[in-house]
């Protein structure tokens, strides 16, 4: 089982992942929790390059670095874990590439699809939970109750977060378009709902879609 979480930073992905891991643990299901970029020695080094605010990276260079990190994670961790029957919860996967590099950076979609196919080895999530939040609200939530968009009481932003509001508006539009194209796999949730409400919806959907997963015979 591969469960992925998507959304712009500040939408609450990490919180919902922790809630889900705890809930699964109570049912005796031990989940492997991973993140993108990262998850292997090489992928973590790539993550540092991608997020370091002093590094200037071209859009195509950014795409290839994210994809290289993903390829390492898929080959070294995800494929073996899925083959052994483990449950994986992944903070970001290829939908982030479509939204961020496709819609955000404007990279050709055909090129994106080709590179995604290579980096994922054709692996697709069983279900994706997308926490939808407007960029302005996400930045407020993450850094300050009042400041938008790029100066938050002295807290330094990483390179991706410095891309600006228009970039994140395009990213959100990308996610919403993915929802239209893949309505069943890609589940949209309102990130402004209380944590417990979102968590309850996630558990309900997992139980509905995969009854033998949460309620094994």
Curated annotation (Swiss-Prot):
Alphabetical list of SUPFAM superfamilies matching this protein: P-loop containing nucleoside triphosphate hydrolases
GO BP: any one term: dTDP biosynthetic process
Coiled-coil region: none
Cell cycle found in the keyword field: no
Gene Ontology CC terms: cytosol
EC assignment: 2.7.4.9
Membrane-spanning segments: none
InterPro entries in UniProt: P-loop_NTPase, Thymidylate_kin-like_dom, Thymidylate_kin_CS, Thymidylate_kinase
Reaction(s) this enzyme catalyzes, per UniProt: dTMP + ATP = dTDP + ADP
Protein name as annotated: Thymidylate kinase
Gene that this polypeptide is encoded by: tmk
